[in-house]
Amino acid sequence: MDRNAKVLVVDDDENIRNTMKAILEDEGYIVDLAATGREAVEKTQKAAYNIALLDIRLPDMEGIELLKLMKDATPRTRKIMVTGYPSMQSAITALNKNADAYLVKPVNIEKLLITVKEQLQLQEEERQFSEQKVAEFIETRVKELSTPF
């Protein structure tokens, strides 16, 4: 399920980006990096990602703003907010703005990997549910069209 899953890591700290990339690539994920919100938006316009790890504070925009832009542009991408400024209010705001998960820096490697796997599983379940609903709709329409008046 998560073999070849694509992950976008968005963080202005190069060390954090590269560390997350190394950890995720060791697990078999395909990882792309962005240092700014604008760069992240550009990348999501060119490629589809399963997961986006979004820093809550970026040099050109707040992570919450990026979260909204990505939600509108890539609704199927699972968005995980990552922050070095943990507070209950920022967590609530992120989750209310449709973040799928929330991690606090310094990110525990095990917690990162578990969260990514959980989000990929949820993404797969949503995909299967959508396919099932489409199949049910088609089946119903075929029956309706096949039934004489």
Task: Cite the ranges covered by each PLM segment.
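C-terminal output helix
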Residues: 107-116
